[in-house]
Amino acid sequence: MKVRSSLKSLKSRHRDCKIVRRKGRVYVINKTDPRFKAKQG
């Protein structure tokens, strides 16, 4: 899992990437390729 201050560029790395909010944090999740996971902060 990568930690970045901005997730906008990480969302465009793969077409299945989605941005979700969980417990006040912003995550990028990817079901088909989990190595694209990222967290904002």
From Swiss-Prot:
Cellular component aspect of the GO annotation: ribonucleoprotein complex; ribosome
Domain of life, source organism: Bacteria
GO BP: translation
An annotated Gene Ontology molecular function: structural constituent of ribosome
PROSITE patterns linked: RIBOSOMAL_L36 (PS00828)
Family named by the database record: Belongs to the bacterial ribosomal protein bL36 family.
PANTHER family membership: 50S RIBOSOMAL PROTEIN L36 2, LARGE RIBOSOMAL SUBUNIT PROTEIN BL36B
Protein name stated in the entry: Large ribosomal subunit protein bL36
Top-level taxonomy: Bacteria, Pseudomonadati, Pseudomonadota, Alphaproteobacteria, Hyphomonadales
